[in-house]
């Protein structure tokens, strides 16, 4: 089968998949867990615990703060130390719940067995029941965007879902958490996909995987034939070319079903597709079949100078410094700590930042990789235009943001930028294109929100 890909732009950064074949280990419990109240797109959560309260693993500690929101559950047992502020993966101080860890006592409602539960054995699982369980468990997109999953499964009346696409691309350099998840929990992922299809009331599913993961392609192709071969569902594993940002939602839809998602506010379901990360499919299985809220995730801890980079199943709230210590500690010399990968990750100033729902990687860049080169004047080469997967003009958007020409920036479609970093990666003048565009995009989106609220 010929590998597919998206049609506009794209780059080929060095993979650096250092932990590709490193089996996942379970990270030890932290001494203290930190839970930011905003771990998703939408309204922050509201605490339902207070200082001195006892909690177990799986206890609700913060309820959804609005329709677009997702509850947060404790990943540890212990005592609530305080409700305070702490630096989260955005780099800013945000409200959080801090819990002192005592033992590892779980809520009795959680099924901790390894038995694989199948959808056909649970007739009570109507589409509505599936969506409710996903919502109540706080499941969000695990690829980094953290959009509440239940909302994607209930599109507006103006849009009709035709298929579910599982995003198993993992095109960001260094990160291998999704790959290890596929190799270690393929059966659960496919049950999760079936639940997503049933919840969305569709019978067609796709799993998009880049060709640099042949073992995962072979394994999931074989499993799909076994699971869905004689069922009413049609599920296909789609090999995709190695090309960044192949895992971008709109790029994935273009590659898999050959449909292009229009500019915002359009979303993939407007062209018939619901896109969910492979980690989300696994979390959906856990939530629906095991009554297990989202409180842990697969995370890669990596860097060229780390002594022992690895993949870990991590309880949310665990400080990054605990994981770095497991890998041999912070390397000597200049280092840059990222929540995420080198293309879209956020640079951090503290190792005390906790693992949250969207933290797919803790990446440490060292030496020259940790230092930015001095920006030079734009040489008008248009390389940034050629690689932009959204067909934008990054040099222009960056300049408009720099001079605060918000009206023109909106006209030039700055809100369509997916912040993939391809422009900045390819710029021979080392200009901070993404930095400027990201700031400008946030400003323009705020202007649009205020205008629509009037």
Range-by-range predicted roles:
Residues 1-48:
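N-terminal, Lys/Arg-enriched amphipathic/low-complexity engagement segments
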Residues 78-80:
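Conserved hydrophobic positions within beta-strands
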Residues 164-178, 305:
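Gly-rich Lys/Arg/Thr-decorated short loops/hinges at beta-loop-alpha junctions or inter-strand turns
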Residues 359-375, 385, 389-454:
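Ferredoxin-type iron-sulfur electron-transfer modules in oxidoreductases and energy-metabolism complexes
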Residues 183-198:
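Histidine-anchored nucleotide/phosphate-binding helix
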Residues 87-147, 158, 214, 227:
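Acidic low-complexity segments
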Residues 50-63, 82:
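Short, well-structured beta-strand-loop connectors
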Residues 202-320, 326-333, 341:
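Hydrophobic alpha-helical positions that pack around
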């Amino acid at each position: 089968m010929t590998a597919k890909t998206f049609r506009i732009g794209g780059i080929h950064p060095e993979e650096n998949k250092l932990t590709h074949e490193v089996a996942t280990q379970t990270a030890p419990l932290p001494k203290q867990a930190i839970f930011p109240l905003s771990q998703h797109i939408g309204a922050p959560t509201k605490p339902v615990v207070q200082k001195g309260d006892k909690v177990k693993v799986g206890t609700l500690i913060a309820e959804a703060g609005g329709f677009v929101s997702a509850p947060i559950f404790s990943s540890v047992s212990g005592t609530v130390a305080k409700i305070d502020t702490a630096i989260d993966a955005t780099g800013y101080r945000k409200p959080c719940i801090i819990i002192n860890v005592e033992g590892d006592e779980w809520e009795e409602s959680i099924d901790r067995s390894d038995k694989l539960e199948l959808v056909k054995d649970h007739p009570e699982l109507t589409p509505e029941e599936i969506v409710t369980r996903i919502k109540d468990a706080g499941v969000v997109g695990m690829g980094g965007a953290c959009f509440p999953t239940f909302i994607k499964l209930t599109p507006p009346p103006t849009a009709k879902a035709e298929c579910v696409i599982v995003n198993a691309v993992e095109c960001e350099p260094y990160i291998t958490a999704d790959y290890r998840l596929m190799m270690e929990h393929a059966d659960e992922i496919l049950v999760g996909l079936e639940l997503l299809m049933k919840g969305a009331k569709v019978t067609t599913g796709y799993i998009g995987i880049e060709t640099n993961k042949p073992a995962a392609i072979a394994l999931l192709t074989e499993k799909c034939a076994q699971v869905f071969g004689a069922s009413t569902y049609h599920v296909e594993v789609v090999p995709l070319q190695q090309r960044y940002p192949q895992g971008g939602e709109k790029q994935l839809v273009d590659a898999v079903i050959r449909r292009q998602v229009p500019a915002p506010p359009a979303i993939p379901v407007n062209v018939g597709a619901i896109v969910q990360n492979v980690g989300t499919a696994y979390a959906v299985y856990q939530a629906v079949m095991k009554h297990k809220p989202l409180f842990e995730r697969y995370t890669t801890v990596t860097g060229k100078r780390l002594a022992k980079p690895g993949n870990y199943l991590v309880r949310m709230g665990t400080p990054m410094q605990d994981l770095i210590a497991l890998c041999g500690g912070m390397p000597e010399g200049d280092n840059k700590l990222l929540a995420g990968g080198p293309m879209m990750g956020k640079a951090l100033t503290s190792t005390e930042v906790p693992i949250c729902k969207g933290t797919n990687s803790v990446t440490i860049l060292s030496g020259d990789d940790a230092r930015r080169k001095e920006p030079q004047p734009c040489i008008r080469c248009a390389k940034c235009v050629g690689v932009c997967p959204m067909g934008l003009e990054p040099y222009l958007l960056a300049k408009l943001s720099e001079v605060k020409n918000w009206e023109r920036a909106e006209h030039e479609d700055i809100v369509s930028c997916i912040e993939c970093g391809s422009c900045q990666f390819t710029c021979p003048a080392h200009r901070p294109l993404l930095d400027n565009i990201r700031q400008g995009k946030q400003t323009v989106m705020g202007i649009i929100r205020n205008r629509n609220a009037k």
